[in-house]
Amino acid sequence: MADWDEIKKLAADFHRVQLTSTAHKLSERNCIEIVQKLINTGLLEVIYTTDGKEYLTPQQLEREIKDELFVHGGRFFLLNLVDLQQIINVDLSHVDNKVSEILRHDKSLVLIQGDLIDKDYLDRMAEEINETLQEAGQVFIAELSKTFSLPTDFMLEVVESRLDIQIMGKLDQMDRNVLYTHAFIARQTARMRGVLSAITRPTQFSNIISKYGFQEKLFYSVIGDLLSSKRIMGSTQGRQDKISFVPDVYTQAQNNWVDDFFKQNGYVEYDALTRLGITDGKQFLKRRYHGNEIFLPTCCVGERVLDQADAAIDDALSSGTWVDIMPHLPTPFTPDDAEQLLQHCLKTPGRSTAHVYCSSIVASDKFVEACKAPFETRMHAKAKKDAAESPALFAELSKKDLASLKGGGGGADRREARKEDRRKTASSGGKGGGSVGGRGGRETKTKKVKKKDFRNRNDEDDTNEADSRSNPDELQFMTTEEIAEVLRKDRPDIDDDFLEELAQEMHRPLTRAYQQVARAVLQSSGDKKRKSHAEIQEKVNALWANAKLFDKSINLFPEDVQVHLSRHLLRTVCTDITNLMVNMLAADHMLAVTDETTITPETRLKIIKKMPEEIKAPLTKLNSSLTAKETEEFFAQFDLVAGQGLCELMIKKLDKKKERQISIERRAALQEQLRHEDEPAMTLHLAVSLLFQHFTSSLLHAPGRCVPQIVALLAEHVTPEQHEILLRCQSLVVKQLTRSGSDEVEEEAGDEHENEAGVEKSTAVLLEEGMREIKKMVLELKKDNSKNES
């Protein structure tokens, strides 16, 4: 408290001394000490100047900043306040902090990119902008921003806040960068209305803007209001920079011309509308007319032209002849137009049997059937001749022919089926497959290249024709050229293009009919090479039963041995089953067959590929299962192929009695073979197979290379002495096979050769003794087993 009183006393003395005009004043040092004391005690806050010779209080710094702002007219152009810092002569950080503090408390000031601006300056700037706007009629925000050196966004904000207050104008709604006066907008609107009202033909807006100097964005903004308010009569068409104004008077003249032409002629060309300035004539007519008009590729037709075409078609169908509708159509019509017009006309009920050729020719079904008459006698004559001279031809019918002939239907049935298929295709809207309309049952649209490539539209018929020509396995009747030659002689009045397409359409039905005749001839002559169904069924049942029993024994071996046993079973017994079934189906479908014992995998695959699709798919899977590592897939596919719809074999299920019978028969067969076998390797193979069947009650079908694994498995069942005999014989057999495999190696002379001969002789003697022991062991084992069973 004493310190404070002392400070107050010193301050009073200091003040008194300053007010007195005495010659005795405080020295500079004393003043500095006093101020420093006040600063240290926190009673006084000062800011040092950059040279350190002066002090400023924060309040004084704020007053000097505002004074400088006032001196500069309300705006101080600064670069990060550096200039202001140099004038006031204090550190820049103090200036920045004080300016920020001023801005927080004084909302009339703003800091924009280093410029400190007050509200009065903005008001004066707005008045200046308004004066410029009233003089020019329009100003751009970007230009104002450049003039006043302020950001565009800030300038736009200032202008918007003072519109209709200090700035008498309007911002463009489409482009906020432009400022207009109301009078300027009114003048421009009046000019635009006058220009557009005087236009009598379509004119691009870009031409109008460039010719009369309109501001583009204002123009598009105003023109929309004028059109929507009906101040100008017209419409726009096009997009972006190519948009045009079409006056109503021009549109009305166009519509009148189109209506008059259509009424007089019954059709209107799209090209004629293009010449009138209508860019999309087809869409224009669709919007214009909503009746029974037909829109063709190049023109629109009305009921008058349709009636002419209908009359010509009805006359041809009722009289059983043909007609080309091109002469009945107006001159500008193209083959494309005629084709599409026929599609529409043939949708009428009662015309489903019509045929279309060359895109414009309609023929009745009666006419087409009459054209087939000359070929009936030729079919029977050719079938008898081919059956006598070339019977191999009948064994190589194509897959499609087999599928259609399997049902045994005649030519009329096949025509009806094909007609129904084409009706479905036509009703789905497709143009392929020879259909020309929703009800066009058998129409063909194949065309020559010179007729604008209409031939390509009949994909199905062209494909069939190409297949018939390129497939050497298909039983052929006549080529298209031969059919055309017969028709040319029988119908000399037919045009060549029409005749060729008619021949192309008739080629497939005539080939089918001939194959049916050929099949009848083949069936009548009989096929003695085909095996009976009962015989094949018996063989398949026997092989299948053995395969199932062999498969059971595979599970008794380790996994690596199971793979070898499964593959051996698939390549032998299962392959024999597959060959029998493939041969049976091939014979049923009139394919060339061979002895199943001589069928190779390549031959079997070729036969399968010639089968119909519904048979080929399951047979292919069955054939593929023969190369698997396990048998499950084969037995699954076997059940499908042997079942209904394919081989239709009655497979008998295995029971205990049947299994015992097969086991006894196999044991007896192996015993008999063992008694007469002299070859050591085969003797050992038969012996271990019999031992395996005896001890496991399972049938074994194994390759020779699996004998060591079988011998190893038998160690658990035979006595050590018996197992020793088996191992010794196995070793001798391996040694003999190894030595016989190296017979071609050059022999060495002298004692070495004699030693080898002695060893070989010793091995042969041991093998002979071992084989006798094995045979005795196995055969006596069977006798002992028989006694035990009895």
Curated annotation (Swiss-Prot):
GO terms for cellular component: endoplasmic reticulum membrane. Residues 412-424 have a biased composition (Basic and acidic residues). Pfam families: E3_UFM1_ligase, UFL1, UFL1_C. Residues 404-478, 741-762 are annotated as: Disordered. Residues 429-439 have a biased composition (Gly residues). Residues 743-754 have a biased composition (Acidic residues). Its EC number is 2.3.2.-. GO terms for biological process: protein ufmylation; response to endoplasmic reticulum stress; reticulophagy. Keywords: Transferase, Ubl conjugation pathway. It is an enzyme of class 2 (transferase). One of its GO terms (molecular function) is UFM1 transferase activity. E3 UFM1-protein ligase that mediates ufmylation of target proteins. PANTHER family: E3 UFM1-PROTEIN LIGASE 1. Belongs to the UFL1 family. This is E3 UFM1-protein ligase 1 homolog.
